[in-house]
């Protein structure tokens, strides 16, 4: 259907997908300019999952319908997948280390080209600056290379202690408790690049769960270049904190084929008591199950997740099975399809 602004389209705050805070989460008090996602029938809008967004008021006489699809990257980008003419990010009017880092990552490169401000200034901003200053500082420090790692690890430990109570709660930037914003010090470490992997492996035993979880996330973002971390990430699948287990199995899925040696332990996460760990486990196995590869040992547990209480978990289990060239997996998918044909909403009061 054609969607106009008075029909209550989705409203977004452009450029806020890396922001932990905005002026005010109350839409009536928000100072940032929003953008209404309007368009003719058939229009498709691609939106970063973490961008601040909300449903706008429908003041028209029409109902507004929407189809929402969630996309997840299944492998680390080894090279540009578009017509690529420039090596460096040059489209922004001002120096922006965050944009440069994302550009390099999409091009299959790690690290930043150069620091945009002195390290002393960036270190000060990392702890006490404004939201934008802290974000820029993280990626500026990431351009300082490995010499900055010990200092950044110290910042990470302090930041973990400071935000621990808030970050476990449902907050405006993490309304469902499943997608917390990364710590700024962790973003700085990730920007340095995978040459830090050996040093980080020694830090995965840190006594603070948020430090362990953050470093698992960092290693996973480095992709196959951090393949030496398989053993340590596998050990952390038995961690006492759900967030560490979740990030550890997610990281294994991102490391590529080398993580296949951890498949039995990854399969065990499909039985985890926390739905968020099960979700990450199903997605990680789906990432390993490239077309033409069978992970037959995972099939029985994936079949169990097909009836998981969480709809996303069910989807990722379907996805993992669909990526396997295996007759048992195919049969499980067909059985699930026929089961889905039964309507669970039919009652004596609503027969049809």
Question: Residues of each region from the PLM?
Answer:
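Non-heme Fe(II)/2-oxoglutarate
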Residues: 52-124, 133-135, 139-141, 145, ...
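Short helix/loop capping segments that flank catalytic or ligand/cofactor-binding pockets
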Residues: 6-8, 21-22, 48, 55-56, ...
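Glycine-rich, charged/polar anion/phosphate-binding loops
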Residues: 31-33, 51-54
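Conserved metal-binding segment of the jelly-roll/cupin
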Residues: 39-52
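Terminal, low-structured helical/coil segments at or just beyond the last alpha-helical repeat
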Residues: 331-352
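Catalytic core of non-heme Fe(II) oxygenases with the double-stranded beta-helix
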Residues: 1-36
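Structural detector for internal amphipathic alpha-helices that build alpha-solenoid repeat scaffolds
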Residues: 96-114, 132-146, 166-194, 202, ...
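Amphipathic alpha-helical scaffolding segments comprising HEAT/armadillo-like alpha-solenoid repeats
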Residues: 115-127, 144-171, 193-205, 224-238, ...
